[in-house]
Amino acid sequence: MAIIDVNNTRIAKLGEYLEPILEELNSKYKKIHADFLGIDVNNYSLDKIPTASEVENWLTGTKICRDVYSFRSRNPYSSDRLSNLKNIGFFETFQKIINSNNDNGILPEIDNIESIECLNQGTFNSADASGKTAVFDIQLQIVYRED
């Protein structure tokens, strides 16, 4: 079995790319996990969504592929309007940064990456049993070329 260089995976590189954005948007940012969202607030997770990865297959043998991820966060949650508006505002700003970075060629350091985009706006997913924290979610897509 081959040894996997986990630091060189697309999901790890995407996490590295997102870290400075999170540090800018949330001074209490802790960590981006892979396929795991902790129970404390200010935790984030990148979860790969199963989709067909091949978008195009060229005659030259080049393939255009994509990965789709659910980027989830656990945030404070309550009936307080201001708190919930902050959660919504976080994802609006996050989406603007991702779109601007893509337009300006600021992309994750992934081999042959062509683009990154948010496929939706961040949205409430679920609240915990106490109603004090909630999971929010936005989908990210990267498109890359395989030669």
Predicted regions and their residues:
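Charged, amphipathic alpha-helical segments and their flanking helix caps
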Residues: 1-38, 52-147
